Amino acid sequence: MLSAEQVEKLVSTRIIVFGTGGVGSAVCNFLVRSGISNLTIVDFDTIDITNLNRQLVANQTNVGKLKVEEMKAQLLNINPNAKITAIAEKYDENSTIDLSQFDIIIDCIDDIKAKKHLIMQAKANNVYILCSMGAGNRYAEIPKFEIADISKTSYDPIAKILRKFCAENRINKLDVCYTKQKATKFDCKTVASVVYYPVMMAGTIVAKVITKIVG
């Protein structure tokens, strides 16, 4: 299906993924299974029992362990020859990660402030960034996600915040993955999630990334 040249592009492309939760863990899994062999993953969190329903990194044996270390082990089990770098830290304005060394940044962070900072740093370093929007509080429809410029998004509350942010900071183009499907309102402060929404979002993100790389 792919030429030797296209496969080499997948192997050599340097990707960094921020966040290894419901969306991020599936993104990492799909990237490596698609031939990506140079991957850096960033997350500060540990695996919780509540992650079992939707995060592909989580299982009964690794509750309490660092997500990035467990994710790295899982990915190397898929491709032992891959170069997987795990960074166990919370991304914020104090981060010292050199984004200029990467070809593609994938943002799967929940924290809005961190998202904004990461977007600004990606643009400052002229590195392509693809951001995930909301996948929670949805369950009753077959998931439908799309990639669009932030200015073209609707319905998504995270995208609404970022549209304003990008306009204020004169960011003319930002690719995001989002859904027009409206979230269900619950009497609960915690955002609920079922596995097929974040995984379908991850599949959409990876499809965009792979096609961008191979042309």
Predicted regions and their residues:
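Adenine nucleotide-associated cytosolic modules
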Residues: 1-215
